[in-house]
Amino acid sequence: MTVVPIRIVGDPVLHTATTPVTVAADGSLPADLAQLIATMYDTMDAANGVGLAANQIGCSLRLFVYDCAADRAMTARRRGVVINPVLETSEIPETMPDPDTDDEGCLSVPGESFPTGRAKWARVTGLDADGSPVSIEGTGLFARMLQHETGHLDGFLYLDRLIGRYARNAKRAVKSHGWGVPGLSWLPGEDPDPFGH
């Protein structure tokens, strides 16, 4: 099992769009990609996350892993990887997010969560670990995860989507933790679980 540090908000790799994974003419993926995917699963699992984008561990490639239920109250989970994802969503509400149902956290903003407006439905298409086409979709928490992880790969954190008092509270939290600068990370399994799982 290989668990690596997760970068914290302020690291340039989190704020830069990732590079698509190169697919050979025969459809094969780079040989070292399988090890990266295994490391991402190990790190996500150690952090008790529902998703992890490659740039969260310092790799600027366009892929994410996930292990997520459709709803916060459900125990049945879906697990997988999407390489070179393309996101499609229903309309994103223009109202203030609900603090009870729209709360969102991030392993790169450890221990904090803020209500974030997201589309109720999302679909991602891309490739699986074998290079075969894959399409996954969902509603609720699963749709939120798809939007969150794809956002990472586009160089955005969920903090960038916050509005009103939630945006102000997030800025204060980042400042109070001393984040927002390059070089900060935490190591799941070694550092305390910031979300108290």
UniProtKB/Swiss-Prot annotation:
Q: Which co-factor is required? A: Fe(2+)
Top EC class of this enzyme: hydrolase
Record-level Gene Ontology MF annotations: metal ion binding; peptide deformylase activity
Active site (record annotation)? E149
- Cofactor comment in the record? Binds 1 Fe(2+) ion.
**Which reactions is this enzyme annotated as catalysing?**
N-terminal N-formyl-L-methionyl-[peptide] + H2O = N-terminal L-methionyl-[peptide] + formate
Q: What does the record list as GO biological process? A: co-translational protein modification; translation
| InterPro entries per UniProt | Peptide_deformylase, Peptide_deformylase_sf
Which keywords label this protein? Hydrolase, Iron, Metal-binding, Protein biosynthesis
- What positions does the entry give for Fe cation binding? C106, H148, H152
- What are its E.C. numbers? 3.5.1.88
Q: Pfam families given for it?
A: Pep_deformylase
The record's listing under Gene3D superfamilies reads: Peptide deformylase
Q: Give the family from UniProt.
A: Belongs to the polypeptide deformylase family.
Function noted in UniProt:
Removes the formyl group from the N-terminal Met of newly synthesized proteins. Requires at least a dipeptide for an efficient rate of reaction. N-terminal L-methionine is a prerequisite for activity but the enzyme has broad specificity at other positions.
Q: What is this protein called?
A: Peptide deformylase
What is the species of this protein?
Mycobacterium bovis (strain ATCC BAA-935 / AF2122/97)
